[in-house]
């Protein structure tokens, strides 16, 4: 029988059909090769948008810099970065007028955070440009290397463990005439393998000292390394993203803390909240505009798109904003916040790995490193690359390009949101002083603009005024990519609004399935994803039940753990059948041990071990939850773990799931091949560093309000904390006298060892 597909939708309101338009099935595209070309594109484009600015030279590094601020007002619709300082300051003043005390209060909140933040804050984050090795490293390693170099150069403030003291060292380092660093290099030797008697190449890692003069050090401190953004859907061309070094990171963190605090108080800001909270915030703004427009006015909404948001923003504007926001604050606070934008006005973009050349005739491949681009003969390149290189050459120093204008992706999301909201704020009738008025939503570079007016001409005038106001602040609304609708239908940050936000369930499809971490985590993540989608994404009970059955089936095929009484033969079926026969209470077996599935949509919130605990045979309980089981290398078990879940588009989301430690929570061992490379020492450093940080967290958990105060090393802080805690526990009778004495003895031993060292 042929089914007419439209029948499927008879009972469904039109807006719910959005899930059927899902385009993102296969894998997203990844980038290969170097990002050098994309980075050059970014640098050249950024300069083009500001080309009518003023050129100056950085006195320390000799880098040419372009300053478009207060440049000529645009005469056409082309994107441009000529923000006008007085307009930005005025927008800030009006924002403060509409929200009395907002800047003052946010400054006070931020000042407290600045004084309490520990330097280990900078270990969060993934790849970071490590200026000592001139390449990317995990954040913890990059920080450790930076601190090590600082100390060997006599910069010791960081020993207190406070981020603000580490930043004092950064400031001092920039005044030094030279910095001595330790770099790694590789030696290769051919040696005979004792076991196989074959010749193998052995790599050893060497360390050597190197001196950087002031200008070389400054270039490295101001460098952003660039990579290609991976897994971006819906684009033909890849684009470059930046990762800053440790000198910049801390300052950026404090600026963003202040901006986040401001965004939290602005009803038009889509940051820093997310999910349902964000939807509620946005629905409020829409409701306000629609309520007011019922009788006399008409209301339209623009789903907005800005052209090259980052490349037209300017750090000098951010400096002006910060100067205004902190104008009544203590000098030290104003200084520390103004450093990030100043560093960004002097930033250098590292061009990445360089170009790969192939000679088809001679079957040769060779890499031209970025450092050589400045003086290599251009006849080897094709036309488009040649043009790029010619354009960028005047800006090059040591394989990095001077990039004063523009902001690179993802650096000041919160602060740029404040700038965007300040324009939305100007739409109130008391500022437009006419019949039209506007409001809207802003989240980094994404915006939705709601305009109300008595007639269509008024709407058009309102949109024009908004467009021109944006131009004055260096924001370029794209007329081609923005579209306008009657209020009630628009899209904002991939949320689709139609008389309320529509659940776009299909976006979550890629996160259903077995994650492949381990049997325990996968089961937990799988049911949590289904539970979360029932809560947040209109996943109905029948569909959820079906999703659950499909998940269990998928899980059993992945781990080859079909029920013990099934006929399916796999590699594990012999053991699983044996276990099934020996088990009295078969309902107690975990699914991963061939047991039945007891999950249904009512009990998804309970970890499987807890769900079946009462049903388990005693000896099975003992085997399952045995921390001494020699075959299982355990992670330290927290009650809640984090999984990274990939929606179809948008950033990877962090999802919490309950973790119960069993012998199924195994951790795969590290690939051995890394242990034979130059990374080995780095890996060991990283593990040691991680252990120290974890230990420190044990003493000062982030939930604790007793932060270590004053200038002390991490060890001293932990010892004094151990003593205080031990005394409290002893006096309240939680620990015995012997334990107390033992703890005190250990503390004294540690101090003694430190003194001898």
From Swiss-Prot:
Keywords, comma-separated and alphabetical: Eukaryotic host gene expression shutoff by virus, Eukaryotic host transcription shutoff by virus, Host cytoplasm, Host gene expression shutoff by virus, Host nucleus, Host-virus interaction, Inhibition of host RNA polymerase II by virus, Nucleotide-binding, Nucleotidyltransferase, Phosphoprotein, RNA-directed RNA polymerase, Transferase, Viral RNA replication, Viral transcription
Originating organism: Influenza A virus (strain A/Malaysia:Malaya/302/1954 H1N1)
Similarity field: Belongs to the influenza viruses polymerase PB1 family.
EC number per UniProt: 2.7.7.48
Motif (Nuclear localization signal): 187-195, 203-216
Protein name per Swiss-Prot or TrEMBL: RNA-directed RNA polymerase catalytic subunit
Subunit and partners: Influenza RNA polymerase is composed of three subunits: PB1, PB2 and PA. Interacts (via N-terminus) with PA (via C-terminus). Interacts (via C-terminus) with PB2 (via N-terminus); this interaction is essential for transcription initiation. Interacts (via C-terminus) with human PKP2 (via N-terminus); the interaction competitively inhibits the interaction between the RNA polymerase subunits PB1 and PB2.
Biological processes per GO annotation: DNA-templated transcription; symbiont-mediated suppression of host gene expression; symbiont-mediated suppression of host mRNA transcription via inhibition of RNA polymerase II activity; viral RNA genome replication; viral transcription
Region feature Disordered, mapped onto this chain: 50-82
